Amino acid sequence: IAGGGADILIEWMPAALASREKGLNLVNIAQPFKRSGMMLTCRKDSGISSPADFPNKTLGVWFYGNEYPFLSWMSKLVIATDGSDGGVTVLKQGFNVDPILQKQADCVSTMTYNEYWKVIDGGLSASELSVFSYEDQGVSTLEDGLYVLEENLSDPAFVDKAARFLRASMKGWEWAANN
């Protein structure tokens, strides 16, 4: 979007705010999802049944803007993220669940609609997992918002095109939900 290759960007709000702070004037023009689907999924056999069990564990975390809710959560719990004694070791997780399946991490980042089910498909049962929703922990953020460059909003033709795109997109989502 910064280079002009796109008019509208899909982004998580923390990443968009970080980009805005660095000078990329993004504006959220639509927020289709009201709740976060982000979770931290942990192996019970690693001794984790509550967030109080996180210290001295390895937690897989997505970056590229997805780390902000995690860091907020650890700050709220007063748990260091530098691998020090009493803190957690942060494993920069790819967008897969291999670290929990291969026991490289005690917990991994998952989404309710995707990676959690990859953990299940990978051979772990729900009864073998402790799952912590970012919503339930009070540290969720808005995901998958639609953003534009602020300066484009002064162009009536752009605003019209974006409005038509949003109406069509929401109509498509409504159709998908109903069918």
Where are these regions (language model features)?
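Short, glycine-/small- and polar/acidic-enriched structural segments
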Residues: I1-Q102, D106-Y113, F132-Y134, S140
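Pocket-lining segment of extracytoplasmic ligand-binding domains
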Residues: P14, F95-N179
